[in-house]
């Protein structure tokens, strides 16, 4: 009898964590990011590609933390967890790793740019080298 009561309570408890994480991570595209950046100067853009990729072109003002470096997650952890971040790479693999880590580390709001830097460049939005 107790098991029948506890199981639904436990499932509800676990689902609240999944919902909370989903609320903190939002998938966006480069057009949405462009609009967001025009509306708010408080957004922090995080490019998780290699330094060579970053130097070849990146969104203006972006921070570069190469997620494949051994110290990448410790660098990410030093960022303000209450900030609003837009994270991108080239194909979503590296940005996905970074976003997952950020969610597990308690970052409040993270946007993953799903079309990556190629999507940004293809729309002819300004970028810097």
Q: Which sequence ranges carry the predicted segments?
A:
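Hydrophobic helical h-region of N-terminal Sec-dependent signal peptides
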Residues: 8-14
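Rhodanese-like catalytic fold shared by cysteine-dependent sulfurtransferases
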Residues: 2-7, 18-43, 52-84, 90-129
């Amino acid at each position: 009898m107790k098991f029948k009561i506890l199981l639904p309570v436990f499932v509800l408890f676990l689902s609240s964590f999944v919902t909370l994480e989903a609320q903190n991570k939002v998938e966006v595209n480069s057009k949405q990011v462009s609009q967001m950046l025009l509306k708010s100067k408080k957004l922090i853009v995080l490019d998780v590609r290699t330094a060579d990729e970053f130097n070849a072109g990146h969104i203006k003002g972006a921070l570069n933390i190469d997620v494949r470096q051994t110290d990448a997650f410790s660098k990410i952890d030093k960022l303000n967890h209450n900030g609003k971040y837009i994270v991108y790479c080239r194909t979503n693999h590296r940005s996905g790793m970074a976003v997952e880590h950020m969610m597990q580390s308690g970052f409040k709001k993270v946007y993953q740019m799903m079309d990556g830097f190629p999507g940004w460049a293809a729309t002819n939005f300004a970028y810097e080298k």
